[in-house]
């Protein structure tokens, strides 16, 4: 990886792209420090200090801590991510959108425009919801009369505009920089919050000094587990099952085509962190509603008890969380991968899987293989997402989003490295041909 960056830096065009990407990421981090007016600075820091484990903590992680500080980029690129996911799902259900995805560059341009509009709407809704949470926490300077209305409009518009600016900056990286812009901005936000590792370390040492010597052993053990987890995620992120394909020879005129061997790659983790995001969003909804309506245990004991069952540290939460990850993994793979289309494409190109007849037997074989790989991927995601929760309960340390952040950081790093290698390979071949 380091050798790739070193070689890329020697190429002027790639050096400009790398510097542009770095500039956008620096501007993004600066925007995460610009406060929104009429909100008490640091008023919500205590709410996130213990690791809420709900959707707010997830949003805070994605924005690099900007949400807890109520800054301009509090929502980060989350509206754009949600809009992209929604459009992917709708493209399967709505024929018009499905046709747009198949219409080449013009169709893709229309899809991007619709996605941007959806993202702006989601950003507005999230901004309004976040405003009411801030209001319930007593962090607003004005809440009544004209001043209250004016401050509400300013706050909501600031959060919405900030999220749209983040999306625009991500798109600029896509066109003028290196790698996926939105992914790199999330990466930058996560890395910026790595200072929390120091806080977790001091908490463990403090407990060890307070008469719990077990935590002296726990610290090096956590370091070893973290290294093992990184290796585990890297291996399974790159792991894939390759289904061999043999293409028949065809004679056209005086030339012979085909007769090559290839393969169909099926990645173990085809869905990335999407199932974890979906599952965490659904599981955290009760807790988010609890924060929104600000329930009191004395006045509403039944409702308070119901929402307490879905506490992040409860066994029920962990069970539901893992089951939803498995379910969403199968669901998302089913949307992305169509064995029938693959079988038809192979048949059209005179390709066959050795030992499998073309047509329905081929699609059945791919479906069966895909089902097995998806199960392995689902178990992998469940371990990565669930293990930090269990470990956090044992150690009493807030590491709830460790699995998600690890998947994102490793995935973005590998994707950016591949993007750099792709640029370098294309430049080499271009120079060779010229």
Predicted segments with their positions:
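N-terminal cationic and glycine-rich segments that engage phosphates or anionic surfaces
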Residues: 1-101, 106-434
């Amino acid at each position: 990886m380091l050798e790739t960056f070193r070689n890329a830096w020697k190429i002027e065009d790639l050096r400009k792209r790398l510097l542009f990407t770095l500039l956008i990421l620096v501007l993004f981090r600066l925007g995460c420090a610009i406060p929104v007016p009429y909100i008490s600075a640091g008023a919500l820091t205590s709410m996130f200090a213990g690791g809420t484990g709900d959707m707010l903590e997830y949003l805070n992680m994605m924005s690099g801590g900007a949400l807890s500080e109520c800054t301009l980029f509090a929502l980060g690129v989350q509206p754009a991510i949600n809009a992209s996911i929604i459009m992917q799902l709708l493209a399967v259900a709505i024929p018009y959108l499905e046709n747009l995805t198949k219409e080449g560059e013009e169709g893709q341009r229309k899809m991007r425009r619709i996605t941007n509009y959806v993202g702006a709407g989601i950003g507005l809704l999230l901004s309004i919801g976040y405003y009411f949470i801030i209001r319930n926490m007593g962090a607003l300077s004005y809440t009544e009369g004209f001043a209250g209305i004016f401050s509400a409009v300013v706050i909501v518009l600031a959060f919405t505009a900030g999220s749209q600016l983040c999306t625009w900056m991500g798109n600029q990286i896509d066109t003028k920089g290196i790698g996926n812009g939105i992914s790199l901005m999330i990466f930058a936000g996560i890395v910026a919050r790595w200072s929390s590792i120091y806080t977790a370390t001091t908490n463990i040492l403090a407990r060890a000094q307070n008469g719990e010597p077990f935590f002296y052993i726990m610290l090096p053990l956590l370091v070893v587990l973290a290294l093992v987890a990184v290796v585990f995620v890297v291996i399974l992120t790159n792991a894939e099952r390759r289904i061999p394909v043999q293409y028949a020879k065809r004679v056209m005129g005086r030339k012979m085509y085909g007769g090559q061997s290839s393969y169909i790659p099926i990645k173990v983790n085809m869905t990335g962190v999407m199932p974890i995001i979906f599952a965490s969003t659904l599981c955290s909804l009760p807790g988010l509603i609890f924060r929104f309506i600000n329930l009191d245990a004395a006045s509403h004991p039944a409702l308070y008890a119901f929402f307490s069952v879905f506490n992040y540290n409860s066994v029920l939460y962990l069970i539901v969380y893992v089951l939803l990850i498995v379910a969403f993994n199968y669901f998302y793979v089913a949307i992305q991968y169509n064995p029938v289309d693959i079988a038809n494409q192979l048949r059209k190109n005179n390709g066959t899987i050795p030992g499998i007849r073309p047509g329905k037997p081929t699609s059945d074989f791919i479906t069966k293989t895909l089902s097995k790989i998806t199960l392995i991927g689902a178990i992998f995601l469940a371990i990565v997402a669930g293990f930090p929760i269990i470990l956090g309960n044992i150690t009493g340390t807030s590491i709830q989003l460790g699995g998600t952040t690890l998947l994102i950081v490793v995935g973005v790093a590998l994707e950016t490295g591949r993007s750099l290698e792709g640029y370098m390979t294309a430049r080499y071949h271009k120079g060779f041909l010229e």
